[in-house]
Amino acid sequence: MPITVEDFEAARPQLLSVAHRMLGSVHDAQDAVQTAWLRAAAGHRAERIDNPAGWLTTVTARLCLDELRARRRRGEAPLLADAIPAEQLSADEAVLRTENVSRALLVLLEQLTPPQRVAYVLHDLFAMPFDQIAQVLDGTVPSAKKHASRARRRLHSPAPVEARRQARQAPDREIVEAFLAAARTGDTREMIRLLAPDSVRDADAALLPPGARTVVTGATAIATETVRFADRIRAICRLTVDGAPAHLIAPGGHPLAVLHIGTDRGQVTRITLRPVRPTDVFAAV
């Protein structure tokens, strides 16, 4: 029985979710799903397809695996947010919010090998059996399990001992989180209360609009300026960066900037913002 348009439309939301977790891009996910449908619609398959959704998922996953491997061959580093067209970035951000996708997880998935990412996404996020995953990877069940296990260890292994110590001993973490909460909602009064009167915000010029000051001093000035960047603050997740705890601004799950917030005596004293570097290594806190 051939796959019908109705079969495809019923499966499309799941296919897009699977492809997005694998590729990290709504645009690329849509391409993979559309290609899977074109292959199904070509009608060259003689055998009966009893599970259209399963067949489409397998084909989509193979296409994603091919794309991930092609990226590796081309030597492509994960795209940083400032290298992605605004329309595509908005689409990626919308998926994170509407589907409640972990921003930090999407960042960390970029550090897996293609087989590890496919095995982890299919099994741990979408509960696909390993015998089917082995078919996608063109390997054995034990090898598929090994890829998923290695992905798990990499994604969920504890941060370095020093990073965990720093995270535990980070002064006034509640103050930092309260400041970020106020920044997300544009609450200038609360930000001013949490900022020290002589606080300093130091940002790389590459992250600011042309002509904006790289250094801003004073609670009122910092709070007023921070309101302009509330959308970026809403795209924050907490990770370790090169072994040290930090906040990462990652619109749509694509890294943009590393944010460090210093405190003293219950107030925010310094905010430092720098662009993400291709050599940065991220890990769960």
Residue ranges of each PLM-predicted region?
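A solvent-exposed, acidic/Ser-Thr-rich amphipathic alpha-helical stretch
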Residues: 197-236
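Active-site-adjacent scaffolding segments
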Residues: 1-31, 35-176, 187
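Hydrophobic pocket/interface hotspot
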Residues: 191-192, 199, 261, 266
